[in-house]
Amino acid sequence: VVQNFSGPQRETGYMHGGISQLLLGDGSGLFTPVSSLESGLIVRGDATSLTINDLNGDGSPDFLIGVNNGNYELYINQFKTNSLSIRLPDYPKGRKFAGSKIWVYYVDNSVQLHQLNIGGGYLSQSAPIIFIGNKQNIDKIMVEWPDGLKNELDVEFLSSDISFLDK
């Protein structure tokens, strides 16, 4: 969570006293707060936007945070995990990623659904990428493009980063 209040009110003054809060999801819809000391996420000032990308290609989400009247702040994820990123390029063979759905099926019959959207941030756009916290025990991955076409990813070739460049 990044504080997102850039309009000061006369009676309260500027709203840039927070330092932000990292929340970790457990896959069931519940989130656990991580202290700033543990996460290293300390955004001083009036943070206005947060975009997520895999900037160093390790399969983990990295943050780029916009600060009102300040410089961008970059946070490279240092946690060592068995994660996976799936990147959908903007225009693979004429297809657009906005609205694409990605289903991740596990061997225990559980399913994760991800949908790529555009917008939702203040003058910012995250990369067309999803992150899967644990790539072990994945049975299959299906991508449904906005035009209805579906692709199945061969899970035998899972690495830390997958791109659908030629689909």
Say what each PLM segment does.
Residues 3-167:
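Gly/Ser/Thr/Pro-enriched helix-cap/hinge segments flanking short amphipathic alpha-helices
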